UniProtKB/Swiss-Prot annotation:
Keyword terms: Mitochondrion, Ribonucleoprotein, Ribosomal protein, RNA-binding, rRNA-binding, Transit peptide
Entry protein name: Small ribosomal subunit protein uS17m
Transit peptide feature range: 1-20
InterPro entries to which the protein is assigned, alphabetical: NA-bd_OB-fold, Ribosomal_uS17, Ribosomal_uS17m_metazoa
Family, similarity comment: Belongs to the universal ribosomal protein uS17 family.
Species of the source: Mus musculus (Mouse)
GO CC, alphabetical: mitochondrial inner membrane; mitochondrial small ribosomal subunit; mitochondrion
Subcellular localization(s) per the UniProt record: Mitochondrion
Example GO biological process: mitochondrial translation
Subunit structure, interactors included: Component of the mitochondrial ribosome small subunit (28S) which comprises a 12S rRNA and about 30 distinct proteins.
CDD domains, per the entry: Ribosomal_uS17
Recorded GO MF terms: rRNA binding; structural constituent of ribosome
Length: 120
């Protein structure tokens, strides 16, 4: 009886695309918090993953979800692009559903109330 094991520990990874120079491959950086046992303080720990992007649909700055491959595609590529969570520059507030830039909502001119024309 053989058990298929993944070659990586992280099955699902959320990270930011930092490079797309390689063909059909995205370079993704994931950040997680690690507790220092002596200081009892959390510090950021970054790890870089290479993910297979078959359609070459992601660009630098996108927030993406990666899925671990059961068998690595190459020495470094062990994940594949599962989903683009947020495209760069197109951030939607999850509570209101409105597009935003930083802490301000982007209002389109069509969504503002218009004044009625008075006919005399």
């Amino acid at each position: 009886m053989s058990i298929v094991r993944s070659s990586v520990h992280a099955k699902w990874v959320v990270g930011k695309v930092i490079g797309t120079a390689m063909i059909k491959t995205a370079k993704v950086r994931a950040t997680r918090l690690v507790l220092d046992p002596y200081l009892l303080k959390y510090f950021n720990k970054r790890k870089t993953y290479f993910a297979h992007d078959a359609l070459q649909q992601c660009s630098v700055g996108d927030i993406v979800l990666l899925r671990a491959l059961p068998v690595p595609r190459s020495k470094h590529v062990k994940h594949e692009l599962a989903e683009i969570i947020f495209k760069v520059g197109r951030v939607i507030d999850p509570v209101t559903g409105k597009p935003c830039a930083g802490t301000a909502y982007l209002e389109s001119p069509l969504s503002e109330p218009r004044e009625e024309l008075k006919v005399s």
